[in-house]
Design a protein with these regions (language model features):
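Short helix-loop-beta connector
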Residues: 16-23
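Adenosine-nucleotide cofactor-binding segment
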Residues: 25-28, 40-117
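C-terminal hydrophobic helical "lid"/dimerization subdomain
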Residues: 97-98, 120-123, 164-215
């Protein structure tokens, strides 16, 4: 479990979240769920999570996500506006010429889906001046319109793997019980069940992470 959580730790580090930032996690597969776990460990929130899978939404809630939505029914960005609104100008996020008086805390969006079209959806939906951390690994050609990012002055950051130090830190957090990982483990199988377990990973309702226990 150290490896996916280290990936998440690196993504959160790349997000450089401040005390007032409100994170939005798009996609609650293994990496998105791990990002939620790291955010909760660090006391960052409220955490908004979005996924179309009921099973994954349930896992996100179990890991501590404060608001969990089905994006087909409720926009996570609408949820952000509800919880990020503030009256103190000192807590406002970054302002721009086009968006000079947005009375909201800053937003950091974690794209943890990794399929074509999602970056464009995030750029179109994310609040102005968001930081978008792309942690989902899209293996196909993708396209998005830079105009959305330019007009909103969105910071687009890509994240991959982790450093040696981050891996060691993640392992230490797990050993100390500071990082919640148990809900991520949805199945435990022996070596003779690995093939069937791998086939089942294509079903988002079945498993998040499968732990292989050698006999």
């Amino acid at each position: 479990m150290t490896e996916p959580l280290a990936v998440a730790l690196h993504a959160v580090n790349r997000g450089a979240l401040g005390d007032d930032d409100v994170p939005i996690v798009i996609g609650c597969g293994p990496i998105g769920l791990a990002v939620i776990s790291v955010l909760k460990m660090r006391g960052i929130g409220p955490v908004i999570a979005a996924d179309s899978s009921p099973a994954r939404r349930a896992l996100a809630a179990e890991l501590g996500a404060d608001i969990v939505v089905d994006p087909r029914e409720t926009s996570p960005y609408d949820s952000w506006r509800e919880v990020a609104a503030v009256s103190d100008p000192a807590r406002f996020g970054r302002q721009t010429a086009l968006f000079p008086t947005l009375p909201f805390r800053p937003s950091v969006v974690f794209e943890c889906v990794g399929v074509p079209g999602v970056i464009q959806q995030v750029l179109a939906g994310a609040p102005a001046c968001s930081r978008v951390i792309v942690a989902g690994l899209c293996m196909a050609e993708d396209r998005f319109l830079p105009t959305f990012g330019v007009l909103k002055e969105i910071d687009l950051v890509f994240s991959l793997y982790y450093t040696v130090e981050e891996f060691a830190r993640t392992l230490a957090h797990l050993a100390a019980g500071e990082l919640v990982a148990e809900p991520l483990i949805t199945s435990r199988v022996g070596l003779d069940e690995v093939v069937d377990a791998c086939r089942g990973l294509s079903d988002p309702e079945k498993d998040a992470k499968v732990l292989i226990i050698p006999a």
